[in-house]
Amino acid sequence: MSADPVRVWYFRTAGSALGDTLVWTLAPVYFVTVVGLSPLQLVLVGTFMELTIFVCEVPTGIVADVVSRKLSIVIGYLVMGAAIVFSGAVAQPWAVMVAWSVWGLGYTFTSGATDAWLADEIGVDNVRPVYLRSAQLGRACALAAIGGSVALGLLSLRVPIIVGGVVIAATGVVLALVMPEHGFRPAPRDEATGTVRAMIGTGRAGARLVRRTPVLLLILAISAFWGAWSEAYDRLGEAHVIRDVGLPSFAGLSFIVWFGVISAASLLLSLFVARPANRRLERASRQTITRILLTADVALIGTVVVFGLAGAFWLALIAMLATNTIRSLVGPLFSSWLNQSITESSVRATVFSITSQADAIGQWTGGPAIGAVGNVFGIRAALVLGASLLSPAVALYARAVRRDGLAQMVEAGA
């Protein structure tokens, strides 16, 4: 039994958004208040996860190119769900680090395969509106899940994490039953060479495509710097609010409810801003998208610095909401930008995986240093340092704009 690929993509988006939001609305609070992680330990959770991604990203991406996109995606969801359940069941630093390392393994099975599967099933030229609409759907589902996460968190901070893991694993089970795979064309392999050598050959082909395509080299560098700054913000943002800024005493709200309110406000603002923007961006040129990505990175530097230095809760809240809104708009645009830069379907998942690997390198190389700064000088200093790591990405976007847009750059490298 199989269904329309666009509907399957929307289902996958909804399942991921529901499960991830159940987990991540309160997971940082769980790490800080229940597990008791220090700033360095918070970052090391991400470092171990990203090291796993770095080691496994290309091999699992090649599996998706040589064997099956669908199989890779299903395995990924099952592994991620099981790892999340374990992290909520065992509230110990070592268990959290092990669980999220295993989650990283599961993620690598999906990171290149999902986007490549969609492009194969509906065509590269049709993916942008699907990305943008699914991003809106994901925000709506996440908004619905925030209330559930808060309600479950009031019982115990472990519960929304465990339930979220179950939702993600269940999404994988349903995908195994309904996901079609009609457009997939395995990378060619000679029967004598076997699967392993075919995987190596596909990986080399993907690397050659990256080397000879200037825009893909730029994208890899941008991904690395993006990973470095996001490590500081993602791991330390909530800890900064809890330990440095403090939550106001208003109507007797629990800190759990406060974080639910912050998450809901962030999503509502993203929906309000994204709806008109998405309609326009469906028809935007690739050069326009490059300029938007450049502007977004400049804005992110400012909002993260303000967030890190803010002493008043309301100033920190405004900066946090602005940062989250900008990030929610950048994600689907960056994916579309990358997808249209890949001219060979047989290595599409591999190139996506290489890009994710660059992001992982940025996170695990920058993460421990940022965490050490947080331990010695405080979380504020770590957040500002992380924001400064976006500056090289801004310069790389500016270079792409100066070279007259993405299309010209691809042609020059082909």
Q: What feature does the model see in each segment?
A:
Residues 164, 169-192, 399-410:
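Helix-loop junctions on the cytosolic side of multi-pass membrane transporters
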Residues 73, 290-293:
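Primarily marks hydrophobic transmembrane alpha-helices of the MFS/SLC 12-helix fold
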Residues 53-91:
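Conserved MFS/SLC helix-loop-helix module at the cytosolic interface between two early adjacent transmembrane helices
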Residues 1-54, 215-263:
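Helix-loop boundary and gating motifs at the non-cytosolic
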Residues 78-92, 297-311:
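C-terminal ends and interior cores of transmembrane alpha-helices
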Residues 1-3, 180-220:
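Juxtamembrane intracellular "pre-TM" segments in multi-pass secondary transporters
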Residues 52-55, 258-282:
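Transmembrane alpha-helices of Major Facilitator/SLC transporters
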Residues 100-139:
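Cytoplasmic helix-loop-helix junction between adjacent transmembrane helices
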